[in-house]
Amino acid sequence: MLRLIVNYPLIPKISHRVCSNSSSKLGSYYDSSSIIKYGGISDVVGKKQELFLSVSVKAVEDKGNNGGGSMSFSGQSWDPSSEIEVPSDQRPVNEYSSLKEGMLYSWGELGPSEFFIRLGGLWLVTFTVLGVPVAAASFNPSREPLRFILAAGTGTLFLVSLIVLRIYLGWSYVGDRLLSAVIPYEESGWYDGQMWVKPPEVLARDRLLGSYKVKPVIKMLKQTLIGTGALLVSAFVLFVFATPVEDFFKTTLGSTENQPEVSISRTSNKFNIRKEQLLRLPVDVVTDDDLAAAAAEAADGRPVYCRDRYYRALAGGQYCKWEDLVK
């Protein structure tokens, strides 16, 4: 945006013949100029004199640092040195430029569709590389598929939410500094903090950037955080009730996974033996096949010798779980 303020000086009346050319500098950016030329002519002595005024303006692109070049106008108290006291990297307009060039923070200036496409791609890559291996170490995908998928998806969504939160905090910080009339800065370190009051021209420029460039980004990031938060809460609640849901689906679909439990109960009723007693029959199961089958089902498919220290040591402890070994 190029702003030009022209002050028209009062040209005094000339009582004698005027034939002169002069130029006066009104105001300029560092790379622009405005020149006014004036002169008078008279045909005959005693006649009414005429005076003409011509203004020629030349403006080129401002080549100041990061679009924040200083300006100088006659009749105004602000001069280019008003921003010199603040280090270049701590000026809000330069912080905004650095934010736009950042690899991650630049996502904020994308359109909503492209922004959500990138978030979806990030979620998919994180889910494949990190979420699935971690969830598989905690939940068996074949026995607990619902809890496995929920654990992997919820963990990945949480990481993506943290990244969106980091982007939001960066844009919110720069937006506050652009909209504020007084900002803190440090001359050389944390121990010499100062406060800088923005001149009116700088404040108008910064608030224009903050209102039309930063606020829409912050609004979109807020909506994204609210959406991811709602998804996280829903996934967590579903994860808590995942086991009852899995049991419901197994019962509804009539899966055959419940048949071993039925056979265990029938065999237990046949021998009138409890499950705890079936697990402590390392000797009797040698001669009774039905009793051995019931004991194997009660042990969840593991060898019965896992519950006996002597036979476990004799067999080498193969196929035994850790809770069996510590007992």
From Swiss-Prot:
Bilayer-crossing regions: 119-139, 148-168, 225-245
Pfam families: CGLD27-like (PF06799)
Topological type in the membrane: Multi-pass membrane protein
Range annotated as the organelle transit peptide: 1-59
Subcellular location: Membrane; Plastid, Chloroplast
Function noted in UniProt: Required for growth in low iron conditions.
Protein name as it appears in the record: Protein CONSERVED IN THE GREEN LINEAGE AND DIATOMS 27, chloroplastic
Species of provenance: Arabidopsis thaliana
Lineage, uppermost ranks: Eukaryota, Viridiplantae, Streptophyta, Embryophyta, Tracheophyta
Designated gene of the protein: CGLD27
